[in-house]
Amino acid sequence: MLASGVVYFLETHVSWSSIAASCALVCIVSACYVVWSLLHVPYDQGIPAVGIPKGILGRAKAVYDSIAHGDVPIAEGYRSVSSEPFKAATEALTVAQWQHNKSGQIFRVPSLMDSFSFVYVIPSPLIPQYNAAPEERVSFTSGLEHLDLTPYTLLSHRFTQSPLHLGALRSTLSGGREVEVLADEVATSFTTSWKFPSQWTTIPNLYYSLLDIITRDVNRAYVGAEFCRNRDYIETIIDFTPEVVRCRTILRLIPGFLRPIVSPYVLRHNRARRDKIHSILGDEIKKRKSMLGSKDSSKPTDLLQALIVEANKSPQSTAESDPKMLVTRLLALNFVGNRTASVAFTHAIWSLLHCESQGLGYWNAMREEVENIFASDDSDEINESKKHYQAQGARWMRWNKTHTAQMGLVESFLKESLRYNTDTNLECKRMIVDPEGYRFKNGMNLKRGTVSAVPIWQIHHDPDLYPEPEDFDARRFLQGDGGAQGRKVGMQTTSEYFLAFGVGKHACPGRFFASQHLKLLLAFILLNYDIQPVSRPEDEWYGSSHMPNMAAGLTIRARQD
């Protein structure tokens, strides 16, 4: 109503020439903002800036270089600023020794993430204190809102300010009950998408094929089978994600005081997508809300139902229970999870096939592990499920948490892929919000408004933590094999030296769900397909993001033996 009213007012009271003049003014102000940001290098006593060439245009060149090579200045700072000479690189260190051997020097790098400002990189000795800092001093929420502009890009401030989705995630997607549902949809989505070709067949674009499959699987747990198999629903969900990234990039180029004015136009496509999802789910949401409080055993147990329950308990239940707000949360959760899982699994497949081209034998070893799990359970219920999937052409069964827990090598392989193919060079982003700043134990102080992060790529490739870190070792995380002391095999286990899901109180709440999903995806491929080994297609860096090749295809056939 408000948007249509604004449009009516503009059409009846404002001339197109004045609109054009306003747009030109916004462009001029934004251009001046960008130029000033690129030329101005603020002085910060005691905290070195890394990666800025000399000269008046050095800052501009550094920001430009960070678009395609954002990893370079962070690697330089980690190597030359935040480190002291190590003990012998071949000597195994405990985590405590490793942290002691680092200097604890914070450094800053220019970045597009913070609207051409600096991101302050927290070295390893300070990570425990950094993660333990109270939210009212070092804020995860403010970091999200400032860096990712979530009140705009995710279409509401409630996703960060009122995170009731966390309770919904914990109640539905972290207890193991989701495994059976995920397993069923994994089989259905691969059967529909890849089918079981008897001859070698090329999947033209692996990343986007997996994105479609993963989005379907995830939404089986989010909204149920009916809607996750609705192509309009899935395609709208998929289209939402790149538009978030595009809108975020545009809004970073615009001064903060102009964003409320410009954002309705910038966000118009994703607002339309939200309206479309609302039109698909609206009646279902109304039906489910009418069932609240009933003891009907047929009530759904998916994430949407949990969101409705959590919204009803909220002090702002009227606003939170609005169907459009519930849809907004679903879109945000799809954005956060689906792209990340698709990137991670695409990286894993390319690493596996590259290892096969090198003759390392991981494919057969993992296939044997999954085969043994598949064959070991011959209960009547499981045998019936095997017959059910066999009728569809798939070698599969009704999986549960006990089955997936037996995938030791598969899980170690996937965790090694998350380490080796880290999808970003900066993680655990925060903003200093304490008016007095925040002082670390080594005396270094970050001022209010400072944006900070942890150098995850460098930590995951640190030879003091991971012997021969540039070698992909699928057995690295098996119990008693390789790596730093005290490591556990579980992908979902976080620490200061394994940060794929963050660490501490702000670790990814969906990591248990994601780890189960990745294992099931790989298990299905191992049981049902042969894949031609290839050398790994070249990866791509976009700012701080490390992406697999987005255009490379994959050649498969139905398993022949």
Curated annotation (Swiss-Prot):
Source superkingdom: Eukaryota
Biological process terms in GO annotation: secondary metabolic process
Pathway named in the protein's UniProt entry: Secondary metabolite biosynthesis
Annotated residues for binding of heme: C508
Localization, UniProt: Membrane
Keywords tagged on the record: Heme, Iron, Membrane, Metal-binding, Monooxygenase, Oxidoreductase, Transmembrane, Transmembrane helix
Entry's EC annotation: 1.-.-.-
Database matches in InterPro entries: Cyt_P450, Cyt_P450_CS, Cyt_P450_E_grp-IV, Cyt_P450_sf
Topology relative to the membrane: Single-pass membrane protein
GO cellular component terms, semicolon-separated: membrane
Main location: membrane
GO molecular function: heme binding; iron ion binding; monooxygenase activity; oxidoreductase activity, acting on paired donors, with incorporation or reduction of molecular oxygen
Transmembrane segment boundaries: 19-39
Obligatory cofactor(s): heme
Function of the molecule: Cytochrome P450 monooxygenase; part of the cluster that mediates the biosynthesis of a highly modified cyclo-arginine-tryptophan dipeptide (cRW). The first step of the pathway is perfornmed by the arginine-containing cyclodipeptide synthase (RCPDS) avaA that acts as the scaffold-generating enzyme and is responsible for formation of the cyclo-Arg-Trp (cRW) diketopiperazine. AvaB then acts as a multifunctional flavoenzyme that is responsible for generating the cyclo-Arg-formylkynurenine DKP, which can be deformylated by avaC.
Family: Belongs to the cytochrome P450 family.
Protein name: Cytochrome P450 monooxygenase avaL
Gene that this polypeptide is encoded by: avaL
